[in-house]
From Swiss-Prot:
SUPFAM superfamilies: FucI/AraA C-terminal domain-like, FucI/AraA N-terminal and middle domains
Domain of life the protein comes from: Bacteria
InterPro entries: Ara_Isoase_C (IPR024664), AraA_central (IPR055390), AraA_N (IPR055389), AraA_N_sf (IPR038583), Fuc/Ara_isomerase_C (IPR004216), Fucose_isomerase_N/cen_sf (IPR009015), Lara_isomerase (IPR003762)
Binding site for Mn(2+): 306, 333, 350, 450
Top enzyme category: isomerase
GO BP terms, alphabetized: L-arabinose catabolic process to xylulose 5-phosphate
Reported function: Catalyzes the conversion of L-arabinose to L-ribulose.
Protein name as it appears in the record: L-arabinose isomerase
Record text on cofactor binding: Binds 1 Mn(2+) ion per subunit.
Source organism of this protein record: Escherichia fergusonii (strain ATCC 35469 / DSM 13698 / CCUG 18766 / IAM 14443 / JCM 21226 / LMG 7866 / NBRC 102419 / NCTC 12128 / CDC 0568-73)
Amino acid sequence: MTIFDNYEVWFVIGSQHLYGPETLHQVTQHAEHVVNALNTEAKLPCKLVLKPLGTTPDEITAICRDANYDDRCAGLVVWLHTFSPAKMWINGLTMLNKPLLQFHTQFNAVLPWDSIDMDFMNLNQTAHGGREFGFIGARMRQQHAVVTGHWQDKQAHERIGSWMRQAVSKQDTRHLKVCRFGDNMREVAVTDGDKVAAQIKFGFSVNTWAVGDLVQVVNSISDGDVNALVDEYESSYTMTPATQIHGEKRQNVLEAARIELGMKRFLEQGGFHAFTTTFEDLHGLKQLPGLAVQRLMQQGYGFAGEGDWKTAALLRIMKVMSTGLQGGTSFMEDYTYHFEKGNDLVLGSHMLEVCPSIAAEEKPILDVQHLGIGGKDDPARLIFNTQTGPAIVASLIDLGDRYRLLVNCIDTVKTPYSLPKLPVANALWKAQPDLPTASEAWILAGGAHHTVFSHALNLNDMRQFAEMHDIEITVIDNDTRLPAFKDALRWNEVYYGFRR
């Protein structure tokens, strides 16, 4: 069972009584056939539920009102099978607060050249019925997605499925609670921000709990539960000699397991699905949570270090969006560069907290080594390299008057050396279009040093996310040129200034 099983998307057909009962009966039959086929064959992440025809303003308004109040409804897919006068939709769309996709399709794939008549033309009017619906969306300045293609087309299926992921993610975000253990890393700017504005814009709440509250729960974990979890470690990871039974760091592994169990219990009891820690607020914990955080991220929790609640929330959102897709998604940080002409590289990592969902190795190494930050016992961590291939890094920043999402398309590559003295998980990548352009554009746009790294999601996914939440997006990819990028930042400043 996944999060998508908790939601459904309503399939709404627009028409009108002008065409008579026989035509409306045919429309209903077509709709039932299409919905059944999509649910059976399209591999959509959640179920489509066909609603009664929308043929009057009152019927359409009732559907939109019901969608708002049904927690299982993640959004609406609308098909204008015949012409449906768009003034009938105004009241419903005015109140609709769920994501909306217009499926611009028709029942037949090809025209019946020899038999086509006016009855056929009147029944199959998506071509201009969809344009009428599009006008009212534009007139009302209402953001909605449009997918054009036959309902049996695989590309249309993929696009609808991708939108469904966004819609479910948006619903989940409205219920998301972010727990901050301690505050921000002191004096850091980008990890701070307006939590009230974030809740208004995205729906997630952010609150702080004292580390002592967490320590209380950690200390309540039984030795039996700790030992059972360590047994799981033994079967899941390659244990270094120091972490094995009778190893000199075995106690550190036991303590890491206790912290993991305590953190998970605290998060479950509070209904949290994202959290932050900071090495400056560890009072009462014996080590910085490294292994615990890595494993919790792999279970779907959002996380970011140093109190960075925006990145923690974004990671959770992207984890939901990518559920069931190939590839992983993780907290990440641009750590250091490799400057080599024609082969500039970025080494991404963090002190400890990189999610194993992006690991190249089937069994990462579990080790305990010294950490010079935090002043605590040596922490346990998983060490691995990252899968290769196309990926993205994304950052959500607070500009005061708006939120900006930055996305850099990257290509992860195999680490050419074993890095024997680097005891942390890492990712190595080439930034598009090149490191100088990508880094300068990122800096000019105010991108954070913390990001969400994903093999599972792509630029189109993040564009949809930005559109659905009505936030600015700046893209750095192979098409980026700095003069045009700077111009776009200036134009965005004017555009969003007018919208205040």
